[in-house]
Amino acid sequence: MTARVWTVEESLEVPLPPHAVYAALADVRRMREWSPEVIWVWPRGRRFVGVNRKAGWVWFGTCRIVVADPGREFAFDNITFGLPVARWGYRLTPTERGTLVTEYWTDLRRHGWRRRIAEVLGLVFTGTPPARRADHNRTGMRETLRRLRAACGPAA
């Protein structure tokens, strides 16, 4: 049996300085431009509601911004029905040609009865079993970063 993966990271260089990439990421309404699943975002201060779609599944999550360090890192926790689900974030590292953007995901469904409930809700709402969640998210993160780079490229 394969060990469960709790954290995934993917990186890609974007041809803009860190502060410009941060500004794009911190405007959470723009997430639907590059995420293959996000279809709508409603921001309210340091919180926002995101609506996602994958195949026939549509679900929402309440998100709370937990790291807002301009030019360095932006991260938020996804909470569903009061249960912690995941932390999504972006670390920004300056490079000679722009910024290395590292998107990361950490599964927060780890302990006791809350974990079991959150896992069932995750399967029901997204159709992705816990054992495949990390691989699914890695694929989505790669696409997100490619779209982010295209949106932040010279023509942006």
Regions flagged by a language model, labelled:
Residues 9, 29-73:
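Short beta-edge strand/loop motif at the mouth of beta-sheet-based domains
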Residues 21-25, 31, 48-50, 65, ...:
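Hydrophobic pocket/interface hotspot
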Residues 5, 56-58, 81-83:
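Glycine-centered tight beta-turn/hairpin loop motif at sheet-sheet or coil-to-beta transitions
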Residues 15-19, 66-72, 91-100, 154-155:
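A short, structured loop/turn motif at beta-sheet edges
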Residues 1-44, 153-156:
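Hydrophobic ligand-binding cavity/cleft-lining segments
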Residues 5-11, 60, 73, 87, ...:
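Intrinsic-disorder/low-complexity, polar/charged segments enriched in Ser/Thr/Lys/Arg/Asp/Glu/Gln
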Residues 81-143:
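Beta-strand/loop substructures that line and gate deep hydrophobic ligand-binding cavities in soluble
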Residues 43, 138-156:
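Short, highly charged C-terminal tails/helix-capping segments
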